[in-house]
């Protein structure tokens, strides 16, 4: 776990988060997750057996000492808003603590959607100014990671930066999906290009590029000035990565913060964990990794808990069916309210209230809340969306052509099943 260095003033570590406000950009649709995000924004997608993706950014804020948070919403925000209202309403108004929901206001140009990530903040500037923060922490609400933002704040102040960008090396073949930077010996950013077709390699490792994680810290007054200027620029795309960060880089005011310095992990020798889970395969793989014997992401660390909305559910139950078959599981996450009757579940993640009936075999599957699996089903390498009713005898994940005809099948062979897909096949979704 991250610890302050001995020469770091403890008072600074305590005061900087109090002087900060975090703004979580949570309006993204996440189109690469296909039908998983038709009715919910990507930050509201379920993850890890009981959480939503946005819980990680919110928990990082709380654990870092930042208790003034704005969540900027847009696409299909109802599920996200409901989750935050139910699970994140424990703040003390008397202590000036809050999670403020900031939907698209159409204040500036009367458009239906935010024009870019920077415009999402600009449209809410009148509200954000009232927070009277000295520092603004800009976060994406759709990434899985654990980070101590107070350590990044200290780095920001000690370097005398006006803007600090969290960064980490990524394989050069994947770098086109990120903002890529070059830094000098003092970690000042000397070049920044958003999603380049030919990403430059790191001088120390030709196989990797230094990528922005979309995590920024700004001096508040400086940020407001930049956003107002950007808003007047008709040629701008009003995006942090495309417009704001390159401009600050040209002015020599942007610094990089290596993610390993503030990444929170139980094993100090492990690789820093950060996942985008932006594709179906990445989402499926990140969920299943949590069910492994030693997952890369430790969610059992009591020093850095991941919080969420907690439902009052009975414990999971594994029962013997009438034929004598035992319900059993191996290397899996099984949440509260689940019942497994006379079936085998291996290397899978079952969210709350999943019911698996007799003679089923569930292998390498992610079953979202309220899924009901009929008798004698075989489910493999799949993601089953919330409240799906899988009919008796259905087989998923064994025949590529059949899977692609009935459902969505990714190039990597991961199958996504939704209620609408099952209805089109004539299967009733009420039980």
From Swiss-Prot:
Allosterically activated by fructose-1,6-bisphosphate (F16BP) and inhibited by AMP. It catalyses: alpha-D-glucose 1-phosphate + ATP + H(+) = ADP-alpha-D-glucose + diphosphate. GO terms for biological process: glycogen biosynthetic process. Pfam families: Hexapep_GlmU (PF24894), NTP_transferase (PF00483). InterPro entries: ADP-Glc_PPase (IPR011831), ADP_Glu_pyroP_CS (IPR005836), GlgC_bac (IPR023049), GlmU/GlgC-like_hexapep (IPR056818), NTP_transferase_dom (IPR005835), Nucleotide-diphossugar_trans (IPR029044), Trimer_LpxA-like_sf (IPR011004). One of its GO terms (molecular function) is glucose-1-phosphate adenylyltransferase activity. Pathway: Glycan biosynthesis; glycogen biosynthesis. Gene3D superfamilies: Hexapeptide repeat proteins, Spore Coat Polysaccharide Biosynthesis Protein SpsA, Chain A. AMP binds at residues 40, 46, 52, 130, 386. The keyword Cell wall biogenesis/degradation does not apply. The keyword ATP-binding applies. Its EC number is 2.7.7.27. Keywords: Allosteric enzyme, ATP-binding, Carbohydrate metabolism, Glycogen biosynthesis, Glycogen metabolism, Nucleotide-binding, Nucleotidyltransferase, Transferase. Beta-D-fructose 1,6-bisphosphate binds at residues 39, 429-431. The record marks 74, 113 as: Could play a key role in the communication between the regulatory and the substrate sites. Alpha-D-glucose 1-phosphate binds at residues 114, 179, 194-195, 212. Involved in the biosynthesis of ADP-glucose, a building block required for the elongation reactions to produce glycogen. Catalyzes the reaction between ATP and alpha-D-glucose 1-phosphate (G1P) to produce pyrophosphate and ADP-Glc. PANTHER family: GLUCOSE-1-PHOSPHATE ADENYLYLTRANSFERASE (PTHR43523:SF2), GLUCOSE-1-PHOSPHATE ADENYLYLTRANSFERASE-RELATED (PTHR43523). Belongs to the bacterial/plant glucose-1-phosphate adenylyltransferase family. Homotetramer. This is Glucose-1-phosphate adenylyltransferase. It comes from Klebsiella pneumoniae (strain 342).
